[in-house]
Structures are given as C-alpha cells and as structure tokens.
Amino acid sequence: MVFYKVTLSRSLIGVPHTTKSIVKSLGLGKRGSIVYKKVNPAIAGSLAKVKELVKVEVTEHELTPSQQRELRKSNPGFIVEKRTID
C-alpha cells in the first residue's frame, strides 16, 4: 500500500481560517509534525490546497512514532561495554 508522508513545514500564523481547518483535518498540529495518509483523491485535493505549507513524500510503508524517533537518533560513536561503580 502507498502512503503520503505529510510534514507541516510552515507555521499557521496569519493563515486564513479555512486553510487552518484543512491542515487540522489532515491531522497536523505544530510545525514539523508528520502524519501518514493513504493515497486517495480526497487527500490529494486537500494537500493541493495547502501545498505551500506542507512537504509531501510518497512512501511504501507507514512508520509509527517510535520508529520515527529511532530514525532521528544519531549514532553516539561509542558503546558502553562495562559500567564501573565508584
């Protein structure tokens, strides 16, 4: 199944109420929030109305919030093998 990965990239400050309601109906809240929506014409129409505010990618699978968090974590560059107690 194919999904749209929708990221809110611009703030909603100063945006008309109708545009805000479209963004809220997509499930986006704060700037940088991410939602996955199944590809269908209704969602595509909503995304076209707010195309200046969102970033859209097409993905094959949906990621859970915990999986998204794991992808954002950086490699610390070391591994703790043994802890010493003082």
Swiss-Prot record:
SUPFAM superfamilies from the UniProt entry? Ribosomal protein L30p/L7e (SSF55129)
- One matching Pfam family is Ribosomal_L30
Source organism per entry reads Saccharomyces cerevisiae (strain ATCC 204508 / S288c)
Instruction: Report which residue ranges the record marks as coiled coil.
Output: none
PANTHER family the UniProt entry points to: LARGE RIBOSOMAL SUBUNIT PROTEIN UL30M (PTHR15892:SF2), MITOCHONDRIAL RIBOSOMAL PROTEIN L30 (PTHR15892)
User: What is this protein identified as?
Assistant: Large ribosomal subunit protein uL30m
Question: Would you name any one GO CC term?
Answer: mitochondrial large ribosomal subunit
Check the record and name the InterPro entries matching this protein: Ribo_uL30_ferredoxin-like_sf, Ribosomal_uL30_bac-type, Ribosomal_uL30_CS, Ribosomal_uL30_ferredoxin-like
Q: Which NCBIfam families match?
A: rpmD_bact (TIGR01308)
The organism's taxonomy opens as: Eukaryota, Fungi, Dikarya, Ascomycota, Saccharomycotina
Quote the subcellular location field of this record. Mitochondrion
Protein family: Belongs to the universal ribosomal protein uL30 family.
Which GO molecular function annotation, any one, does this entry have?
structural constituent of ribosome
Assembly and oligomerization: Component of the mitochondrial large ribosomal subunit (mt-LSU). Mature yeast 74S mitochondrial ribosomes consist of a small (37S) and a large (54S) subunit. The 37S small subunit contains a 15S ribosomal RNA (15S mt-rRNA) and 34 different proteins. The 54S large subunit contains a 21S rRNA (21S mt-rRNA) and 46 different proteins.
Q: Where does this chain mainly localize? A: mitochondrion
